[in-house]
Amino acid sequence: MSGNDEAAAAGVAPPQTLQFAPFESQIEMPFYSALFSRKLDHDKLDDSVRPVIGLYQPMSERPPAESTRMQIQGGALSSSHVPMGYTRADGSIRNFNTIEDFKKADKGAILRQAGAQIWDAIKDGSIYEIPSLLSSFAILSYADLKKYRFTYWFAYPTLHSVPAWRRDGPLARFSSKETTALVNEVGTFRYAHDTRQHGFFLAKKVPYRSGPFRRGLPRDDSDGDDIGFTWSIGALGEFEKGFFKGIKEEDQYIAFVDSSSYAENPSWPLRNLLVLIRQRFQLQKANILCYRDTQARRDEPRSIVLPLASEGPATPQTSEMPKVTGWERHPSSKLQARVISLAEYMDPTRIADQAVDLNLKLMKWRISPKLDLEAMRSLKCLLLGAGTLGSYVSRNLMGWGVRKITFVDYGNVSFSNPVRQPLFEFEDCLSGGVPKAPKAAEALKKINPGVEAEGHVLSVPMLGHPVLNEAQTKEDFEKLQQLIKAHDVVFLLMDTRESRWLPTVMGKAEGKIVMNAALGFDTYVVMRHGAAPKDGTESTLGCYFCNDVVAPSDSMKDQTLDQQCTVTRPGVAAIASAMLVEMLTSVLQHPQREHAPAPKATGPPGNPEYQRDPPDHALGIVPHQVRGFLANFQNMIISGESYPNCSACSSPIVGAYKSDGWEFVKKALSDKDYVLELSGLAEVQRQAEAMQNEVDWDEDEDVAAAEEGDGEML
């Protein structure tokens, strides 16, 4: 006759099989963002196991199917803080680098390893220090950072009890007064113990002793709260220290925080607790307190007491680990991973912003770990010119993560522009064309809503061009001055040489990084202007005007149609723009930034080689100038020091601008000889002419002497 048959014959209800409510994973959205950020910025290709904290709490007011939630909150990877009312579960996560690695992972071995951690802690007693391991979990995941898809699978490792445990009687509940006293004592216990102890504890009813004192306090029965005993709460480890000594068996309780709201079914953590009870406590019967009460509703009894007994006779302690199960089932009830698409829950603007950062951060994983991406991201870039060069430069800057881009241009979009200038469309040309600068800024925002782009319509004052409206010219100058001061980098991308003169002067005076690109039919030059010397003594690199012995003048006067348009091979602008932005990036990776020296050439003159300076530079060399020739598809790296008599960056010019501001500019625009004289170029020209005259005179004298000599020989 079976045990159940014997019980029935004796008129006793047979023991009931225990059924447990498994945990249901619940990942909050901030956790995904935290995991993605950790993968990009910290873990990179390291897919080692990381600790993670889970939280659960009594959920008696929820429907049973929704009550046993294991919550993974935003700070689960970085914080061990446990909010009031929650219970801690110690878990781990392994985020694989590829979906193939995720699929190939040995799920059985991973589960056994997680179970072994619990089993070993039970055997050696360390479980008493970290009872939260009894509700531990493991997560396998793969985060597709490009598509914002998260594949994951939770395991809640559970040790099987052999023989199994069964109900040994009807469940019991406490009265409202008993529950209130219990909740108060549990709160005191939690206040005095580590959060890892909060989920599992011992409880006992201590009868009032004869006499007037209860725990050292006078008894007061007049308040109606006398329940005939006091609650005493202890940690699991106190069992082996005699916590229940002298306490009647029916007043001894082994408790765990039960998140289940099922009427008679406890939640998952009890299964591991029962293994501990048999292995460490050597018990075959136990009163299990499924603690479901909360401080806020402590007068509403919700906890239940399950009297449990082992189905079979006691087995001797064993070192062999029991069977382990625990993989979470898919909502379809199958044992398989879950997939969530985060894109539908996220702000598209934020997705675009993170996607840009993703492409850049991936470069740091294997190729260039020392790359300083923040140096580019934080830049404020001013683009003088919103045409062909401005369009391509801005797109390349966004590719490097630059968020602040400002355009300055005085022109409108014409019908010839859209095919060469990718920020404009056919509709922008209608009705005389829209202003380029604001339209270019608008186009950037459509490409990446996270970029802070703006456009200003103003005319840059130019040498050699008459001042027709002094008030307007001064207003344009002051606006340009404000913009240059407010930005870190100034790009000179205009059509004419003379339009680059004033921004060169202003950029040098304000200590800004000035980048310059100019195009020919099949040639181009990209360069960085030399920065102002730190101490005013050392030499610096030259600017766009340092090779000139004349000041800029009106280059647009008397131009034919082919001279009025930028006549260049269509690919030249894209090549030059990309190279200019890459040069800026290399500058910012150098420890001296804009003060970085030009690279030194080694090897034969016809085939020079350039070494990284410093050797660990993240991107390579930092050229001063690159001149490209599309006819033979060659580039030349050139460097040159600043010219003491330069019309734009020499000390007299920059000093006059700093001291006089607009008055200097007005005089330079109205007096064609002012810049020549101030810079010293006029004197250089006079000396050159004097030398030329002297050379001409010497040549005439030599010819005359030769003729006389010839005559004498005859």
From Swiss-Prot:
E1-like activating enzyme involved in the 2 ubiquitin-like systems required for cytoplasm to vacuole transport (Cvt) and autophagy. Activates ATG12 for its conjugation with ATG5 and ATG8 for its conjugation with phosphatidylethanolamine. Both systems are needed for the ATG8 association to Cvt vesicles and autophagosomes membranes. Autophagy is essential for maintenance of amino acid levels and protein synthesis under nitrogen starvation. The lineage of its organism: Eukaryota, Fungi, Dikarya, Ascomycota, Pezizomycotina. Homodimer. The active site is at C565 (glycyl thioester intermediate). Belongs to the ATG7 family. It is found in: Cytoplasm; Preautophagosomal structure. CDD domains: Apg7. Residues 591-616, 691-714 are annotated as: Disordered. NCBIfam families: E1_like_apg7. It holds the Pfam family ATG7_N. SUPFAM superfamilies: Activating enzymes of the ubiquitin-like proteins. GO terms for molecular function: Atg12 activating enzyme activity; Atg8 activating enzyme activity. GO terms for biological process: autophagosome assembly; autophagy of mitochondrion; cellular response to nitrogen starvation; piecemeal microautophagy of the nucleus; protein modification by small protein conjugation; protein transport. Residues 695-714 have a biased composition (Acidic residues). It comes from Pyricularia oryzae (strain 70-15 / ATCC MYA-4617 / FGSC 8958) (Rice blast fungus). A motif (GXGXXG motif) lies at residues 380-390. The GxGxxG motif is important for the function, possibly through binding with ATP. Coiled coil: none annotated. One of its GO terms (cellular component) is phagophore assembly site. This is Ubiquitin-like modifier-activating enzyme ATG7. Keywords: Autophagy, Cytoplasm, Protein transport, Transport, Ubl conjugation pathway.
